[in-house]
């Protein structure tokens, strides 16, 4: 068994993401029996000494039957209505499942915007930390009643990666109807040329020959979403296991199933992770070629002299994207000036600026190359 599977097996803090298809029958009916099976596997992991945070999809699916809908709704308003009804059923089901073990659950509803704003980000972190300290099981879900993009894309995959870093998890386990990563769709590959199972991914280069298809009709997150989220978490230093919910006992036990994504050797700091992945960019700075080299290759601070244009609406302390002359993003960072102020400084040497404007536009400590 690889060192990364060993790390997942021995992780003391784990985030488990459970997709919609893991909680429904093939016909789309919310299945409490499946949820109880998953709760049993998670309980076994917690009894072994791990803290577990659950990121659970399934609110919309759980709302279909109570609202007497015949299928998953297509329009946004009905999706949000189903989510508002289904979230109650979902959390009650988790509460009943863990109640068998005399455990209390706590509901945490988030959107990507909550994670992106530093104050809300810190509040969410404190809440999750406190729930764990009080030995409650945190059930995290996207707030589908107010979110829009989250309903259309991701099925909590990206959120789970963000939460894993938010709580300082030692491992992220993604459970759905997908048993791991293949270089093609195993359901469509011919018998004489079956899709090859990929046991371990060391980095993006290992995915060069992988063809990712679309997800199930019940969820919104397909393989593309899962790959993106797994690579995000791994890049931040968190090992990831992608496995089938049916294999949850093994995934949460000895981590012998599924595909493991190896983490980068050094864990990214919380601030750099927030700048790189979590924060919403409020604007864009366009850099000349010399500034791109200084920022990307030399890891130096960005000076106003290297900025040729600014766009968006930002203020000092906001996160902005740094783009080259071809409009390709090369970095993200925390800008030191308001847009109106920075616009008067473009292309000017530091020595030509007033003393109060001689700080870098983006300090090297607040820069993350992409």
Swiss-Prot record:
Its gene? proB
| GO BP terms in the entry | L-proline biosynthetic process
Query: Which pathway does it serve?
Result: Amino-acid biosynthesis; L-proline biosynthesis; L-glutamate 5-semialdehyde from L-glutamate: step 1/2
Q: Which species expresses this protein natively? A: Mycolicibacterium gilvum (strain PYR-GCK) (Mycobacterium gilvum (strain PYR-GCK))
Which Pfam families does this chain map to? AA_kinase, PUA
Domain (PUA) spans: 282-360
**Keyword set for this entry?**
Amino-acid biosynthesis, ATP-binding, Cytoplasm, Kinase, Nucleotide-binding, Proline biosynthesis, Transferase
User: Its Enzyme Commission number?
Assistant: 2.7.2.11
Functional description taken from the UniProt entry: Catalyzes the transfer of a phosphate group to glutamate to form L-glutamate 5-phosphate.
Q: What is this protein called?
A: Glutamate 5-kinase
Q: Per its UniProt entry, what is the enzyme's top EC class, as one word?
A: transferase
